[in-house]
């Protein structure tokens, strides 16, 4: 069981990742925080909570990503339209990454300096019908991917369509019967439900 104290209470588990000896848990319901617990004994270690809109602060975390390559934790705040980078070990703030456009639904970090975002289709077509956008840390769009079906306008399903399986980045778009793998800067179908 996880430690329960005033500082470690949470209202929901919206995302959960395990890395090394730690559990990273996102609660958007009660605390607007990423909480960190020990995998060995469930003890609460620390948290970063939504406290404001200054440097290193967020209001409503939507999702997070652990970059295993550089030891960083990224937190997406859709309300403030910003992506924040923290040190994975001590949760010290490191940088703010500029988004290519307002309010992506999800993101990941496929390689250092590159950010892959998932955007819903909108009335104003921002990316030529594509839903996945690769951008640099300044928010400059490098390339776009995935011709979205009409159902791409419906915001329902997994809020974190990116995941790593057997060391490979995978993507599962909303309402899709396919799973894609990020290979050589492109999305390739790796599994399809028939």
Residue ranges and their predicted role:
Residues 77-129, 144-151:
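Asp-box/WD-like beta-propeller blade repeats and closely related beta-sheet repeat scaffolds
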Residues 157-180, 188:
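A conserved active-site cap/scaffold subdomain adjacent to cofactor or substrate pockets
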Residues 3-10, 43-70, 77:
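Blade-loop segments of beta-propeller domains
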Residues 18-20, 66-70, 110-113, 164-166:
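Residue-level detector of Asp-centered blade-edge/turn motifs that repeat once per structural unit
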């Amino acid at each position: 069981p996880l430690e329960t104290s005033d500082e470690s209470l949470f209202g929901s588990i919206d995302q959960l990742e395990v890395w090394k000896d730690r559990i990273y848990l996102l609660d958007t319901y009660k605390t607007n925080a990423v909480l960190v617990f020990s995998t060995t004994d469930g003890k609460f270690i620390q948290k970063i909570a939504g406290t404001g809109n200054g440097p290193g602060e967020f209001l409503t975390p939507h999702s997070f990503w652990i970059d295993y390559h550089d030891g960083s934790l990224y937190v997406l705040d859709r309300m403030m339209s910003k992506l924040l980078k923290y040190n994975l070990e001590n949760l010290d703030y490191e940088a703010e990454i500029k988004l290519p456009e307002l309010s992506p639904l999800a993101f990941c970090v496929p390689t250092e300096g590159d950010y892959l975002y998932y955007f819903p289709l909108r009335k104003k077509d921002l990316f030529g019908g594509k839903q996945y956008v690769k951008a640099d840390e300044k928010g400059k769009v490098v390339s776009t991917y995935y011709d979205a079906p009409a159902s791409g306008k419906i915001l329902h399903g997994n809020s974190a369509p990116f995941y790593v399986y057997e060391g490979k980045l995978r993507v599962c778009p909303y309402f899709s019967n396919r799973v894609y793998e990020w290979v050589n800067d492109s999305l390739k179908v790796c599994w399809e439900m028939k």
